Amino acid sequence: MGKFAATIAMTAALVAGLALSIDRATAIGPTATAKPGAPAPAFSAPDINGQTIGLADYAGKIVILEWTNDGCPFVGKHYDSGNMQALQQKYTAAGVVWLTIASSAPGEQGYVTPAQARADLARWRAAPTDFLLDPEGIVGRLYDARATPHMVVIDRASRVAYMGAIDDKPSTRLADVKTAHNYVVAALDATAAGQPVAVTSTRAYGCSIKYKEG
């Protein structure tokens, strides 16, 4: 093979390899369909008691989705301060459905078994409506969950009212909870009052969700 032909062949191989790596990275990352203002993608997933729970089960209700990771310090900030539990108690008492979700794959940091999830709820004294297990990452990808905590507010018409960070303080400091602007509270209160949500999307901060490859 001539020098020019060899160079062409090598270049083609490099391009092909790069294309393959890009395709693979795209395939294993979240593929979102949820968009603010658009219908919330339907889903179903098992809860920690083995029951299949679907978004359609809560038609006509305000629903909040909370992606969690029991080993993530950004999640710990909101549980160790009591912030997340207080929000769960306040809004579920008002009729809001609160679904906590774990989407990390088996063998990855953040994955929990049903028993581990129940232990987390007891340790945190958490009060969600239910805890869903998503080890295949199907629900997480639908809602572009990339980091924990990732939060989604769905209105009574089953449209996405807000998705993204819980607040505007991307830190692990417990003291920051008191001074933060909580996007989820703002979205929930506006949605409950039938008012427009001022901020409908932000970038979630926290620990990356380790999705199943493939």
Predicted feature residues:
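Bacterial N-terminal signal peptides that target proteins for export
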Residues: M1-T11
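Bacterial N-terminal signal peptides
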Residues: A9-A19
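N-proximal helix/coil linker or "cap" segments that precede and/or mark the start of modular domains
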Residues: L18-A42
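A short beta-strand-turn-helix
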Residues: A42-V63
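Short active-site neighborhood of thiol/selenol oxidoreductases, capturing the structured segment around
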Residues: A56-G76, W98, L188
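Structural microenvironment flanking redox-active thiols in thiol-disulfide oxidoreductases
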Residues: F74-W124, D134-L142
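Short, internal strand/loop/helix patches
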Residues: R118-D155, R159-M163
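Thiol-/selenol-based redox modules, centered on thioredoxin-like
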Residues: V153-G214
